[in-house]
Amino acid sequence: MDKMRPRVVDVKEIEPNRKRGGDLRTLLTPVTVGATSGFMGLAIMRPGERISEHYHPYSEEFVYVVEGRLEVDLDGETFPLRADQGLMIPIDMRHRFRNVGDEEARMVFHLSPLAPKPSLGHVDTEAPAISDDVKAYPLVQEESGRPERPGVLS
């Protein structure tokens, strides 16, 4: 049996993913480090920026705000989040993040367990906000092993 080896991944090594809002960097993943139980990343949001509403049908999401002030909508209810606070988002709970502060916000996120396939792990429920540096993309949900929730865009 092969033994996994530790690997350090620098945030600068990871291409930004801006298609759902914010600058999402998935650092520690099955692809980057051979993770088998989940993945971890960093969300960077400019003032006024948001990450569009979505949910995870197979994973809990753990977040920790490193800097800045955020609001998170959890199944339609809004909660404040600030630096040095953490939050656990249960499986199937819709959520959206907004930077409501005057400075950049940084939030570490971890999802576990992994979905059976990457395409099943994230379900968009609204279109992303379009900014100057991101183009609109079609919201197409791939094949799913679980029923969609009402209101899911497809």
From Swiss-Prot:
Gene that this polypeptide is encoded by: curC
Residue span, Cupin type-2 domain: 42-108
CDD domains cross-referenced by the UniProt entry: cupin_TcmJ-like
Coiled coil: none
Name this polypeptide is given: Polyketide synthase CurC
Keyword DNA-binding: no
BP terms from Gene Ontology: antibiotic biosynthetic process
Keywords: Antibiotic biosynthesis
Pathway given in the UniProt record: Antibiotic biosynthesis; curamycin biosynthesis
Compositional bias segments (type: Basic and acidic residues): 143-154
